């Protein structure tokens, strides 16, 4: 029986017909404790999902759908290393990277031992660099760490580093290079000193074009200062699942950190792919980061579905995507330190859930995924919230609020007020009675107020979740990221798709190689479609006129 044929799914269709014409204002008017009932705390996070177009029966039916998809079994498979891809290879075992309290796995003991060894290696290097004992080619201590990677190898560490900057030990600084455009590289290193700069090359296969090209630029940049290749070897570290290729590329064996094949790039910040972060904030704080994620893992495994934060977050997304036909979802963090979080979550969602084939190879017959995007509040309020408030689409929003930036900082009351104000306005709207009252109180005549009111109405009934962190620290950040990882995994289980591959991306890389050869006038262009062939010829024409 397919997902859409299951009894809970059919019941959800009827429930959608019932609720689609109702307004959330009425839910709150009829239930004064709705905000209390539809909220929970776990792993250092507070989650309010009361401003959603659901009642308790909806939640029950969504949970029944999850059970019908064998979610309990699939959760245990995630934590036991029993998930495999179409080739039978283990995937999605990133949760093992943060099992900080105990290692009660019945299988994969070798993986656990390797993780422990990796922790020790990360810890030792972090201590050496932070204490100034790791030297460059002129015997000066390292002050700047440049992470070269792309996708999850860059987005995760950069997002976490920016979020945890108050925990970075001066004078250490981290920088992140990912783009093939050489501007990214040269603008980053422009103010750096080659004598005190360490490059961390992160590539699972060590064949990624963008990463290896930037590594070549780094080598050239260092050689201009050091003159001799043997002097710059201490300025490179590698994080990879292909250590032999990294060594062939010139990275010393002792400077190679393991990234296992069963860790996807977008789930890799917990591994040595987070080496730059571990160095910057120190091993103790990095371990807190892992501990926060582990706390959310424990909650995810143990809590009942209707009290389970990741599961509820996922089921609400399913509700809007598959029944309200939402095509997009927004993430709005109200903290400058979370500026890169929307980009990170965009990749996590869209690369994991952008699939049209089920696990058995058959076609998907229901919508999967959505465009996930966002920006910082309050910037976003003056940019695109207008679409949320008076547009015609259903766009679910996750608001993320931080009460205090750190133990020493003041409460972020103005930010919090804006965050909560947006969520309330999205829910209740601004009806004609309220608009007219406010306009008349401003001294506007009734006839003119009638004309103006039409343009100021806000229908409301737009869904949102609010997630609150008491303080943005390594523990709470780890918990927040794990929350969204598990949310995405639950969605993949219900849609019966593989969240751990990205073959569409791989195909694009392959075609880029063919097109590059054509642009270098080395191959026949007849294999390309007429549009691509014409574009190639246009580039060659301009290239011929401009050396």
Curated annotation (Swiss-Prot):
Superkingdom of origin: Bacteria
Broad class of where this protein is predominantly found:
cytoplasm
Q: Which cysteines are joined by disulfide bonds?
A: none
Classification via Pfam families: PGI
| Active-site residues, record numbering mapped to chain | 351 (proton donor), 382, 509
**A GO molecular function held by the record:** glucose-6-phosphate isomerase activity
User: GO CC annotations?
Assistant: cytosol
Ordered alphabetically, the record's keywords are: Cytoplasm, Gluconeogenesis, Glycolysis, Isomerase
Any idea where this protein resides? Cytoplasm
Task: Name the top EC class.
Answer: isomerase
Pathway in which the depicted protein is active: Carbohydrate biosynthesis; gluconeogenesis; Carbohydrate degradation; glycolysis; D-glyceraldehyde 3-phosphate and glycerone phosphate from D-glucose: step 2/4
Q: Could you say which EC number(s) this protein's record lists?
A: 5.3.1.9
Region forming the signal peptide: none
Please give the Gene3D superfamilies that the UniProt record associates with this protein: 1.10.1390.10, Glucose-6-phosphate isomerase like protein, domain 1
Q: Does the keyword Isomerase apply?
A: yes
The Gene Ontology biological process terms listed for this entry are:
gluconeogenesis; glucose 6-phosphate metabolic process; glycolytic process
Q: Does the keyword Nuclease apply?
A: no
Task performed by this protein: Catalyzes the reversible isomerization of glucose-6-phosphate to fructose-6-phosphate.
Q: Do you know which PANTHER family this protein is assigned to?
A: GLUCOSE-6-PHOSPHATE ISOMERASE (PTHR11469:SF1)
What is the designated name of this protein? Glucose-6-phosphate isomerase
Q: Recall the taxonomic lineage recorded for the source organism.
A: Bacteria, Pseudomonadati, Pseudomonadota, Gammaproteobacteria, Legionellales
């Amino acid at each position: 029986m397919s997902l859409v044929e299951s009894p809970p799914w059919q019941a959800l269709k009827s429930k959608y017909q019932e609720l689609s014409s109702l307004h959330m204002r009425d839910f709150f008017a009829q239930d004064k404790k709705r905000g209390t009932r539809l909220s929970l705390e776990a792993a250092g996070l507070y989650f309010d999902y009361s401003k959603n177009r659901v009642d308790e029966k909806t939640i029950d039916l969504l949970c029944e759908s999850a059970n019908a998809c064998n979610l309990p079994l699939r959760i245990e498979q995630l934590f036991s290393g029993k998930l495999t891809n179409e080739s039978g290879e283990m995937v999605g075992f990133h949760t093992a990277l943060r099992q900080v309290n105990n290692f009660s796995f019945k299988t994969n003991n070798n993986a656990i031992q390797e993780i422990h060894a990796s922790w020790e290696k990360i810890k030792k290097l972090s201590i050496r660099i932070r204490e100034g004992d790791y030297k460059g080619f002129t015997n000066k201590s390292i002050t700047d760490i440049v992470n070269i990677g792309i996708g999850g190898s860059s987005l995760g560490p950069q997002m976490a580093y920016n979020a945890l900057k108050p925990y970075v030990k001066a004078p250490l600084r981290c920088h992140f290079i990912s783009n093939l455009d050489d501007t990214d590289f040269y603008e980053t290193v422009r103010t750096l000193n080659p004598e005190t700069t360490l490059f961390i090359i992160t590539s699972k296969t060590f064949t990624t074009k963008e990463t290896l090209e930037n590594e070549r630029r780094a080598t050239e940049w260092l050689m201009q200062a050091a003159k001799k290749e043997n002097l710059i070897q201490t300025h490179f570290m590698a994080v990879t699942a292909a250590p032999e290729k990294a060594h062939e590329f010139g990275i010393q064996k002792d400077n190679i950190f393991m990234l296992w094949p069963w860790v996807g790039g977008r789930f890799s910040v917990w591994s040595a792919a987070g080496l730059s972060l571990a160095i910057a904030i120190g091993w103790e704080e990095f371990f807190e980061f892992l501990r926060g994620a582990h706390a959310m893992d424990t909650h995810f495994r143990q809590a009942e579905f209707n009290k389970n934060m990741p599961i509820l977050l996922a089921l609400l997304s399913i509700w809007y995507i598959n029944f309200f036909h939402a095509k997009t979802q927004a993430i709005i963090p109200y903290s400058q330190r979370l500026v890169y979080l929307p980009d990170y979550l965009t990749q996590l969602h869209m690369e994991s859930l952008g699939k049209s084939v089920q696990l058995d190879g058959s076609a998907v017959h229901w919508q999967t995924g959505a465009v996930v995007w966002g920006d910082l509040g309050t910037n976003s309020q003056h940019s695109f919230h207008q679409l949320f408030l008076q547009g015609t689409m259903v766009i679910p929003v996750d608001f993320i609020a931080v009460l205090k930036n750190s133990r020493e900082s003041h409460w972020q009351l103005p930010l919090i007020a804006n965050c909560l104000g947006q969520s309330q306005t999205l829910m209740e709207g601004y009806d004609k009675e309220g608009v007219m009252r406010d306009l008349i109180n401003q001294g506007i005549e009734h006839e003119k107020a009638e004309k103006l009111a039409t343009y100021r109405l806000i229908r409301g009934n737009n869904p949102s979740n609010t997630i609150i962190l008491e303080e943005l620290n390594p523990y709470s950040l780890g918990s927040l990221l794990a929350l969204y990882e598990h949310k995405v995994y639950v969605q993949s289980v219900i849609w019966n798709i593989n969240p751990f591959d990205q073959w569409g991306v791989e195909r694009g890389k392959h075609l880029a190689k063919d097109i590059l050869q054509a642009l270098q006038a080395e191959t026949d262009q007849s294999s390309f479609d007429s549009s691509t062939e014409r574009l190639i010829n246009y580039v060659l024409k301009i290239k011929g006129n401009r050396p």
